[in-house]
Amino acid sequence: MNYSSKKTSGRISMVVKQYEVGNFAVFCYLIGDEETQEGLFIDPADDAKGLLSEAKSHGLNKIKYIVNTHSHVDHIMGNAEMVKKTGAKIIIHEEDAAALVRTPPYLLEMFGATASPPADIQVKEGEIIQVGNVKLKVLHTPGHSPGGMSLHLDGMVFTGDTLFVGSVGRTDFPGSSWDVLENSIRKKLYVLPGETVVFPGHNYGSSPTSTIQYEKRHNPFVRG
């Protein structure tokens, strides 16, 4: 676990936890409302048993959603097991929904992965994903994939493979685009307040989190 926070705002007692899971340095996030005991996972790529144990230790006994920031296999390979254990509904951006269930068999074999069930809910820009009284706003941030999305929550943004600490997502995959990715970062992420904490989709940087202000000043790929 790299980041741990509990925040009380009004009636909301919010849990935010960061975990590095699997063999590909994927960051998974547990977010929930202690009062209602509802939670969700962002990109639970591996170790469903361990993640659920963590959720219960923080009083989150009902995992309502699995939110995928995009459809690439390293982020969705834990979906099937998590759905089996929790009955949680899968959420993904509408432009990545088809790709979620079309992972090539050779990639599944290469990653030792099980195919994901289809999405239960498809979202788009500006929609709200809610667990208890905790609300995450969908930011469509394509470029790494057509339906890549980030999630904005109370001074935090979960950026998937759009923006990393000191780096950005690859754009050499089918459906990727450097111009689109750069536009997403500039128009959707760099417009957020500078103190907004960046929670990336992989542990690729010098630290597990960053801020919008830091990335605008120091990210060598996209300067603000």
Positions of PLM-derived features:
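Conserved S/T- and glycine-rich ATP-binding loop of Class I adenylate-forming
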Residues: I31, T69, T141
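Short, glycine/acidic-enriched loop or turn micro-motifs at the edges of active sites
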Residues: E35-T36, D46, V73, D96, ...
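Hydrophobic residues at beta-strand termini and immediately following loops
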Residues: Y19, V123, I212
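Structured loop/turn residues at beta-strand edges in well-structured enzyme cores
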Residues: I12, H58-N61, G132-V134, G194
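Short acidic-hydrophobic surface loop/beta-edge motif
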Residues: S5-S9, Y19, I31, E127-V131
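Metallo-beta-lactamase
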Residues: P105-L107, I128, K135-G224
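Active-site HxH/HxHxD metal-binding segment of metal-dependent hydrolases
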Residues: G39, D46-V131, R217-F221
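Conserved beta-strand hairpin/beta-sheet module of binuclear metal-dependent hydrolase folds
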Residues: R11-H58, S150-G160
